[in-house]
Amino acid sequence: MNELFLKIINMSISASWLVVAVLILRLVLKKAPKWVNVLLWGIVAVRLICPLSFESALSLIPSSETIPLDIEMAVKPTIDSGVPAINSVVNPVLSSFAPPQHVLTSANPLQIWIPILNIIWLIGVGSLLLYTAVSYWRLCRKVDTAVRYKDNIFQSENVSSPFVLGIIRPRIYLPFNMNGQDLEHVVAHEQAHIRRKDHWWKPLGFFLLTIHWFNPLMWLAYVLLCR
């Protein structure tokens, strides 16, 4: 389990470089179509899912394995971020954790801290999954009495703002007080979200956020994906 945790950490670190690159590209491509935005974040998603990475001198990812999987057993623990400046700051701190060479029976403190961090990570993942399940259940109950307007469009007195719910068969939910041109405009907007498969990408993005919840850049990436 500790090895899986370290792999997740490494994938998250590698994806962070891509997030920074996407943020820069978003500034350059402000007027690009919406699908370009989804494509850019899709590249980040692939890196968060796939443990394999291709490194090169031109790669945006300096190192695919910043933290060695056997670091907790290393006599002198070090990382390789691919950025010398970062290594020069972090590695001396890690080395200070190592027990003196003449003390052979002392455990590497990382053998203690990594399992603890692993447990904290699992608690975070479990908490977010539980929050998601409860929120989805409450939302389904909220629109349980919704009335069909037409096709996959429903209206409910319990809805205050429009939204799309469902992955396989997405439905558009609207408040009852919406009608006329406003209603048609909102429906067209929500249908555009469905055509772009936002009802797929956003749940996928949140699932990845659940796994990489400890990384602030992933929260920023998810917020920007949902815009």
Language model region names:
Residues 1-130, 134:
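Hydrophobic membrane-embedded segments
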Residues 22-25, 184, 218:
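Interfacial helix-capping/hinge residues at the ends of transmembrane alpha-helices
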Residues 29-30, 57, 131-145, 158-161, ...:
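Juxtamembrane transmembrane-helix termini
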Residues 34-39, 153-156, 168, 208:
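Hydrophobic transmembrane helical bundles of multi-pass organellar membrane proteins
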Residues 62-63, 161-163, 209:
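Small-residue-rich loop/turn and linker elements
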Residues 142-199, 223-227:
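Polar-ligand-bearing catalytic/cofactor-coordination segments
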Residues 196-227:
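Post-HEXXH active-site segment of zinc metalloproteases
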